[in-house]
């Protein structure tokens, strides 16, 4: 018997308080008191009954001494499994109770079976749940820790479960638990009364502080803290006190919350744990908590150590240890809608990227300054970030570990550094604070937006921060070194430059190097030594990107409407930028045989949606022969017309191109809106009128161009045997009697419009302005003759002469044959014929002044097709 008592005494001296309490719990004895008191209670069972009466136990324990010894031996064997040192290595002295086993730093209350519940029972049953913390992993009773929201319902098992101590450590990472004098105590709800009010409740507990614990909490970085937590809180990691909570520690009242007692804690609110270091003392301490709340809480007392901001920041994983750069880049691509090309090739997502890049603000949502270290919570699906240091500093006081972008609650262990945006912010550290935006493409490439300290940051970078390869600007090769084309915006009128100069003799000639094929100006005539092959190759540029050719198009749409074009006659490639909309019908030379058009020589231009519209064939041609006096340039049309002719003034210095100034430099003229031509070497043109029934007739004009510089006459075929002679008409005069034929023509101010400077003489013109526009006969196709005008400009002295007889051309309407276009000056002079839409009784619209040479508006259904007949020169 003595050996049994001696063996049990040695084992009891080795036990911790928890093992002693566990033994006393199995024996049915009280578990309060110091460790020596607990040992004495167990040893008393191994002695006589006098010891039991001495300790004041009123009932005799039914267990025998052998049963008590067996319980002690089983407990000792369990501790041996946990690597307890062998008793043989220790002194067998019965009075050796000074040995104190090393307790675990995280939680001293951790049984060998790792079963710890707030109900203080270590029994294992069928309904258990384990903590997910790798350092804890304790098992708890499911019914004790999972509380349903409504009574009678079953509690929902969370996907990730943490015990109350692990939740406490994550609620405020600036406090780390160093000990638990009072383990979690469940504050069970007492229900409500019949009138629906909660029943006041209070619980009183005692905890013991040893001398070492007391000395620890007296240190500056340690404190004794009381905490409380709602078991089924929606915000898992926070403290929360019940309503009307009142706390007393050793009889001293302690305030727990600053909000009113009746106010519930909101979803974004946080409660703090009061510090009771000044209220505690060494030894036994009593704590009492009362409340009026039907919810289930648990509270406890812990020894906590403060952490600094730097220490908390060190808990955040480094950039290399956190998320990989590939995952961060994939998230950015997903958020911008670009995604990975290989993975999302078959994606049918509704998100479409419209902009080439997205502007991302690098300002921290908390501080408003540019982020230094880009931080984020790992579970967040957005790409927004915040400044890591600022976020941690703010949470030292607020204890709200919540994403400022999506407002979801997390813990410190979910905080990380974003590797994608952190590379960008690290490159911007030397920039000014106003540089806080970057443009990010869907593939992850980026550039700094704004004035950066370095020009390299304003260039596009790869996602990893390296510079993108600069794209080389590929300029189209010119067909000829003398041919240049300069593009401009649609903000204003540009100019048309022709490379000609006046020689010392007063004769205009091409201002370039000598060339066998370049045309020369001799005796007021344009001649070409090679049969005028200078205009063989014509490069055409469209005037209307929308192909509508309307005078009311938005200039922002017609980006190609205004260009600088250099027309050089010293090479074989010349640019006709959208010739006049109403330049005649066709061209013909009598010295060439007439040929029928081939299918390949016809180009049909139409913006109609209908595919089977009837084509308008070219009915008439321009006869490229001279008149009786050898100086005519007859134009043949069908309809009522007028012939006006003016002879130039053969003064000194006014040659065939006397309209120009005496400056020896290249002259410059404004570029009017021209109709689009097409790149064919042939010279046949057919344009359409206002009437949908126009088939083989061309709309007549009431006037023609008297081309004074080269002594040309514009002859009109009026459909009768003789030409009609009329008085000279006014030049582009704005009149209400015109009925909209020329809508507020600004050319009425002769000499003011720069577009006509190329046709004005060098001296003041004496052309009388007359007007006779009333009672005119309609053309056979229904278009009134007042719908056609001509700009008659000439040098002084010839304006009052009688017009020469018209060269009437009554030949049948035949297709155009091969011909060569006359020199550029002749063609440019004839390209000003303007067709204006007939609008009976319409008022003049001043808003269309700037579009005097534009094509008239027509509905799509009445706009006929254009048949462009071009004959190829076989030579």
Curated annotation (Swiss-Prot):
UniProt keyword Zinc-finger present: yes
EC number, as in UniProt: 2.3.2.-
Enzyme class: transferase
Domain SAP, residue spans: 12-46
Listed Polar residues bias regions: 808-819
Sites where the protein binds Zn(2+): 380, 382, 403, 406
Pathway recorded for this protein: Protein modification; protein sumoylation
PHD-type zinc-finger residues: 114-169
Gene Ontology process terms (BP): protein sumoylation
Gene3D superfamilies on file: SAP domain (1.10.720.30), Zinc/RING finger domain, C3HC4 (zinc finger) (3.30.40.10)
InterPro entries, A to Z: SAP_dom, SAP_dom_sf, SIZ1/2_SP-RING, Zinc_finger_PHD-type_CS, Znf_FYVE_PHD, Znf_MIZ, Znf_PHD, Znf_PHD-finger
Keywords: Metal-binding, Nucleus, Transferase, Ubl conjugation pathway, Zinc, Zinc-finger
Localisation per UniProt entry: Nucleus
Entry GO CC: chromatin; nucleus
A molecular function GO annotation: SUMO ligase activity
Superkingdom assignment: Eukaryota
Annotated function: Probable SUMO E3 ligase that may regulate Pi starvation responses.
Family per similarity comment: Belongs to the PIAS family.
Protein name: E3 SUMO-protein ligase SIZ1
């Amino acid at each position: 018997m003595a050996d049994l008592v001696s063996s049990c005494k040695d084992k009891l001296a080795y036990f911790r308080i928890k093992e002693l309490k566990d033994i006393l719990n199995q024996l049915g004895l009280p578990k309060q008191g110091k460790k020596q008191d607990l040992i004495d209670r167990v040893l008393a069972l191994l002695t006589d009954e006098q010891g039991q009466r001495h300790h004041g136990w009123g009932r005799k324990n039914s267990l025998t001494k052998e049963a008590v010894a067996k319980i002690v031996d089983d407990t000792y064997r369990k501790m041996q499994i946990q690597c307890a040192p062998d008793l043989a290595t220790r002194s067998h002295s019965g009075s050796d109770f000074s040995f104190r086993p090393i307790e675990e730093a995280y939680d001293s209350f951790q049984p060998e079976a790792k079963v710890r519940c707030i109900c203080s029972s270590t029994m294992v049953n069928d309904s258990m749940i384990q903590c997910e913390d790798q350092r804890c992993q304790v098992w708890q009773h499911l019914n004790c820790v999972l509380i349903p929201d409504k009574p009678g319902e079953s509690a929902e098992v969370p996907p990730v479960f943490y015990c109350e101590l692990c939740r406490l450590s994550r609620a405020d990472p600036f406090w780390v638990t160093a000990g638990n004098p009072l383990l979690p105590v469940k504050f069970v709800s007492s229900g409500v009364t019949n009138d629906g009010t909660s029943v006041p409740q209070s619980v009183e507990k005692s905890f013991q502080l040893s001398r070492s614990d007391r000395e620890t909490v007296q240190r500056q970085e340690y404190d004794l803290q009381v905490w409380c937590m709602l078991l089924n809180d929606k915000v898992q990691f926070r403290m929360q006190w019940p309503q009307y909570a009142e706390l007393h520690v050793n009889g001293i009242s302690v305030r727990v919350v600053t909000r009113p007692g009746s106010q519930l804690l909101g979803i974004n609110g946080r409660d703090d744990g009061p510090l009771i270091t000044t209220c505690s003392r060494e030894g036994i301490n009593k704590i009492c908590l009362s409340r009026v709340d039907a919810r289930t809480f648990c509270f406890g007392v812990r020894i906590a150590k403060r952490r600094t901001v730097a220490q908390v920041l060190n808990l955040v994983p480094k950039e290399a240890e956190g998320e990989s750069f590939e995952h961060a880049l994939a998230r950015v691509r997903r958020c911008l809608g670009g995604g990975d090309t290989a993975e999302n090739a078959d994606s049918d997502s509704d998100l479409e990227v419209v902009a080439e890049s997205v502007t991302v603000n690098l300002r921290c949502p908390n501080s408003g300054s540019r982020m230094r270290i880009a931080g984020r919570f790992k579970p967040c699906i957005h790409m927004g970030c915040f400044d890591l240091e600022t976020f941690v500093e703010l949470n030292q006081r607020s204890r709200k570990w919540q994403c400022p972008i999506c407002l979801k609650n997390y813990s410190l262990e979910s905080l990380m550094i974003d590797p994608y945006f952190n590379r960008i912010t690290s490159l911007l550290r030397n920039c000014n604070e106003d540089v806080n935006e970057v443009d990010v493409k869907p593939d992850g490439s980026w550039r700094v937006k704004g004035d950066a300290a370095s020009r390299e940051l304003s260039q596009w970078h790869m996602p990893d921060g390296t510079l993108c390869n600069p794209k080389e600007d590929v300029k189209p090769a010119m067909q000829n070194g003398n041919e240049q084309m300069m593009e401009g915006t649609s903000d204003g009128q540009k100019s048309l430059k022709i490379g000609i100069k006046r020689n010392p003799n007063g004769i205009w000639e091409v201002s370039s190097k000598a060339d066998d094929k370049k045309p020369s100006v001799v005796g007021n005539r344009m001649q070409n030594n090679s049969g005028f092959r200078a205009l063989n190759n014509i490069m055409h540029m469209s005037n209307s990107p929308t192909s509508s050719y309307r005078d009311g198009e938005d200039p922002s749409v017609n980006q190609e409407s205004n260009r600088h074009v250099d027309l050089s006659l010293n090479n074989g490639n010349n640019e006709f930028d959208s010739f006049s909309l109403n330049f005649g019908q066709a061209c013909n030379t009598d010295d060439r045989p007439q040929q029928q058009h081939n299918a390949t020589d016809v180009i049909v231009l139409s913006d109609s949606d209908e595919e089977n519209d009837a084509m308008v064939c070219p009915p008439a041609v321009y006869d490229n022969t001279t008149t009786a006096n050898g100086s005519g340039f007859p134009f043949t049309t069908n309809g009522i017309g007028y012939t006006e002719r003016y002879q130039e003034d053969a003064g000194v210095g006014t040659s065939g191109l006397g309209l120009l100034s005496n400056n020896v430099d290249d002259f410059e003229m404004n570029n009017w809106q021209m109709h689009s031509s097409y790149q064919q070497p042939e010279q046949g043109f057919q344009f359409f009128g206002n009437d949908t029934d126009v088939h083989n007739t061309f709309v007549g004009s009431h006037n023609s161009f008297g081309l004074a510089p080269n002594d040309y006459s514009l002859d009109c075929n009026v459909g009768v045997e003789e030409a009609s002679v009329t008085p000279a008409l006014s030049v582009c005069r704005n009149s209400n009697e015109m009925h909209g034929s020329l809508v507020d023509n600004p050319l009425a101010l002769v000499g003011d419009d720069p577009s006509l400077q190329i046709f004005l003489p060098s001296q003041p013109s004496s052309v009388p302005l007359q007007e006779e526009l009333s009672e005119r006969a309609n053309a056979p196709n229904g278009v009134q003759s007042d719908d056609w005008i001509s700009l008659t400009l000439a040098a002084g002295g010839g304006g009052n002469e009688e017009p020469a007889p018209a060269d009437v051309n009554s030949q049948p309407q035949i297709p155009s044959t091969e011909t060569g276009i006359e020199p550029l000056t002749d063609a440019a002079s004839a390209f000003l014929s303007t067709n204006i839409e007939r609008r009976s009784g319409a008022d003049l619209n001043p808003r269309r002044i700037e579009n005097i040479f534009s094509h008239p508006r027509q509905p799509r259904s009445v706009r006929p097709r254009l048949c462009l007949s071009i004959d190829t020169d076989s030579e």
